[in-house]
């Protein structure tokens, strides 16, 4: 993988190594092939690129970690600095990393149950070919990137019709997601479980429990957020529609 660093046109690194992926493992060494941790691998890649292009600041990389960690970019950057110091990669490389590269915090918001095992035969009949890479996901999607607006000109995902926002701070969107998506799940779980319902869709479609979860979302959880209701209500309705159509625990 290290040869990727030698490609002059390379510009972006996007990762999702799960919540456990951004960790500092002091046992990683600079000559590991490759390092076992993701931040270790990334530091190796960046250092090889730095040496390949003799510290050219036009060859820096823009890095978007998508791991579900609040301020994931800050955590990843902090971990890279730890490897720079541990491996004694030098002040010149550290300066290049600081000035030529950008590590930006992101927030991804989309329910992705994964491979639709129960519906795959119907899907294959519709497609008229076998596709074992089918992934089921809700229609709603949001990718918040805490980065300057000029980065959006290099990464114009919104021009492709994707709901990608470049914002000064991801914090309000993180709070919104935790409150309106994760919050209802937390409230719903014990009530549905004790009622003999294990699937979110079935709980939302239940006459009593469905009414209960709507009341919690719109009359209680939403009131705790310091954001305009005009912005919050469409998001809440979208999450509800997803819960009512996707089969997930």
Regions found by a protein language model. Name each.
Residues 1-241, 247:
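Substrate/ligand-engaging "lid" and interaction regions
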């Amino acid at each position: 993988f290290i040869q990727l660093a030698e490609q002059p046109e390379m510009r972006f690194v996007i990762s999702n190594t799960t919540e456990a992926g951004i960790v500092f493992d002091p046992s990683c060494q600079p000559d590991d092939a490759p390092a076992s941790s993701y931040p270790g691998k990334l530091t190796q890649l960046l250092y090889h690129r730095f040496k390949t292009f003799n510290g050219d600041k036009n060859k820096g990389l823009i890095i978007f970690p998508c791991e579900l960690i609040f301020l994931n970019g800050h955590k990843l950057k902090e971990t890279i600095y730890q490897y720079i110091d541990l491996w004694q990669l030098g002040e010149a490389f550290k300066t290049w990393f600081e000035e030529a590269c950008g590590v930006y915090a992101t927030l991804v918001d989309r329910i992705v149950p994964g491979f639709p095992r129960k519906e795959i035969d119907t899907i294959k009949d519709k497609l008229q070919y076998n596709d074992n890479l089918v992934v089921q996901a809700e229609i709603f999607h949001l990718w918040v990137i805490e980065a300057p607006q000029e980065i959006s000109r290099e990464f114009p995902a919104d021009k492709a019709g994707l709901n990608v926002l470049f914002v000064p701070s991801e914090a309000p969107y993180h709070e919104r997601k935790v409150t309106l998506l994760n919050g209802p799940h937390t409230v719903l779980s014990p009530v549905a479980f004790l009622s003999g319902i294990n699937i979110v869709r079935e709980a939302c479609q239940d006459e009593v429990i469905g009414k209960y979860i709507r009341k919690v979302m719109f009359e209680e959880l939403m009131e705790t957020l310091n954001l305009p209701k005009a912005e919050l209500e469409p998001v809440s309705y979208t999450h509800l529609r997803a819960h009512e159509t996707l089969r997930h625990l």
